[in-house]
């Protein structure tokens, strides 16, 4: 009801905690101001709560109040007002609004009672088909259902959502969508149900709604390219919630973001999304298809887009990709990896992926470094990976074992000898010249 509180940041992230290390880096690359315009106010709340572990708590409390004061979460908003004003009393305006909210809830419940009971009757539901017009005719003729009753489900669902009752909202909007032929309201209900599933952390259902929203954008807005661009931008941002919280969503959404329509949207409207796409691709290295052509294609596509969009957007995550695969600068890649870790730990969506990113990035640095050098100094490579010599030695042993490269470790000399196939000329090229002319060829080799 009105006392509901939006889900916490902890509930919507995969167990990662906010850290206050290197605040200057994290704050410099904070994307919250860019994300907020593309999110519903209820979806913004967990991001603000996450920031409360990093920023001035009093400012965050005030921001929460400004965010939610126009919703029907009256009890929670009243509590925020008390906290801001250091008061034990609740102003009359909140008491009055609470009474109004309760009265409206009762009104909507009464209006929709008949149709909600019918839709819970298995005998009635068993007679429904995929044809909405036929379903409405059946319900009208057999049970006296009217269009107004169907629309009451929509109004009631929206009101429950405004009260923070996201589970109830999802069910009501689903019931409305089953029966309604009003395309605009059905599209609105789909967005409402998507937000509700996100806020109840029902990721499988959320992904179903992502697909429905995508289909709606393609069909309903077919002749409206500007509308498609705006709606795709919203869908991209909303999809970040399941992207890093639901493993099966990772491949689906990575493919979606790389698809022509959506990568064009990212480049045109929201290039900062490259941070999340880069994090997804890099961490995909640790997943099942890390050696497959799918991963290699993702990496090549990422490198291409990062190179193209460098003038428009960059942060330590995209700069890491650029340093390693465009500039082939291992020292810069090491520097950017350290900064990237701090940015990841300060990002609501990526905090739980920070360790996986660092692990995968070290592997990518190692693999790239080993591919272009014949003799590798263990101490030097360890430094590039941000490890001490003992840790670096263990790392390299594991790398050789896991990737099955042909290499020998000379513990006495502290080196690794790479037995590259004689037909590979790229090592010779990179060791004899650092010219930019050859970097495209090296890139192809590293990403292959």
From Swiss-Prot:
Belongs to the eIF-3 subunit E family. Residues 254-423 form the PCI domain. The keyword Cell membrane does not apply. This is Eukaryotic translation initiation factor 3 subunit E. It comes from the Eukaryota. It comes from Emericella nidulans (strain FGSC A4 / ATCC 38163 / CBS 112.46 / NRRL 194 / M139). Coiled coil: none annotated. It holds the Pfam family PCI. GO terms for cellular component: eukaryotic 43S preinitiation complex; eukaryotic 48S preinitiation complex; eukaryotic translation initiation factor 3 complex; eukaryotic translation initiation factor 3 complex, eIF3e; nucleus. The lineage of its organism: Eukaryota, Fungi, Dikarya, Ascomycota, Pezizomycotina. The gene is int6. One of its GO terms (biological process) is formation of cytoplasmic translation initiation complex. Keywords: Cytoplasm, Initiation factor, Protein biosynthesis. It is found in: Cytoplasm. Component of the eukaryotic translation initiation factor 3 (eIF-3) complex.
């Amino acid at each position: 009801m009105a006392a509901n509180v939006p889900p916490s940041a902890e509930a919507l992230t995969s167990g990662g905690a906010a850290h206050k290390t290197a605040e200057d880096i994290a704050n410099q690359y904070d994307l919250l101001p860019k994300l907020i315009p593309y999110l519903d106010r209820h979806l913004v709340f967990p991001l603000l709560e996450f920031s409360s572990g990093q920023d001035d708590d009093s400012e965050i409390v005030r921001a929460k109040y400004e965010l939610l004061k126009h919703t029907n979460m009256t009890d929670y908003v009243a509590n925020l007002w008390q906290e801001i004003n250091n008061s034990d009393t609740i102003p009359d305006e909140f008491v009055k609004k609470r009474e109004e909210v309760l009265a409206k809830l009762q009104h909507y419940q009464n209006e929709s009672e008949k149709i909600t009971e019918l839709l819970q009757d298995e005998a009635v539901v068993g007679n429904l088909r995929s044809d909405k017009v036929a379903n409405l005719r059946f319900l009208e003729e057999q049970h006296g259902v009217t269009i107004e009753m169907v629309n009451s489900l929509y109004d009631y669902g929206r009101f429950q959502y405004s009260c923070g009752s996201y589970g109830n909202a999802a069910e009501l909007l689903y019931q409305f969508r089953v029966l309604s032929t009003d395309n605009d309201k059905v599209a609105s209900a789909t967005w409402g149900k998507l937000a509700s599933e996100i806020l109840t952390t029902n990721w499988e259902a959320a992904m179903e709604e992502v697909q429905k929203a995508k289909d709606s954008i393609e069909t309903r807005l077919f002749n409206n390219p500007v509308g498609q661009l705006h709606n795709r931008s919203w869908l991209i941002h909303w999809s970040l919630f399941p992207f890093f919280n639901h493993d099966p969503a990772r491949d689906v959404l990575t493919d979606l973001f790389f698809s022509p329509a959506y990568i064009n949207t990212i480049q045109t409207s929201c290039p900062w999304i490259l941070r999340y796409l880069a994090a997804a691709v890099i961490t995909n290295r640790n997943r099942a298809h890390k050696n497959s052509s799918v991963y290699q294609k993702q990496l090549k596509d990422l490198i291409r887009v990062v190179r193209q969009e460098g003038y428009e957007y960059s942060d330590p995550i995209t700069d890491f990709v650029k340093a390693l695969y465009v500039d082939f600068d291992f020292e810069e890649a090491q520097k950017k990896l350290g900064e990237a870790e701090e940015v990841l730990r300060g990002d609501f969506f990526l905090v739980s992926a920070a360790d996986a990113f660092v692990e995968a990035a070290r592997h990518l640095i190692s693999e790239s470094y080993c591919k272009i050098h014949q003799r590798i100094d263990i101490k030097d490579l360890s430094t590039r990976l941000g490890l001490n010599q003992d840790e670096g030695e263990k790392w390299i042993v594991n790398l050789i074992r896991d990737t099955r490269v042909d290499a020998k470790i000379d513990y006495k000399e502290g080196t690794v000898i790479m037995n590259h196939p004689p037909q590979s000329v790229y090592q010779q090229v990179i060791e004899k010249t650092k010219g930019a002319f050859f970097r495209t060829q090296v890139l192809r080799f590293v990403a292959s």
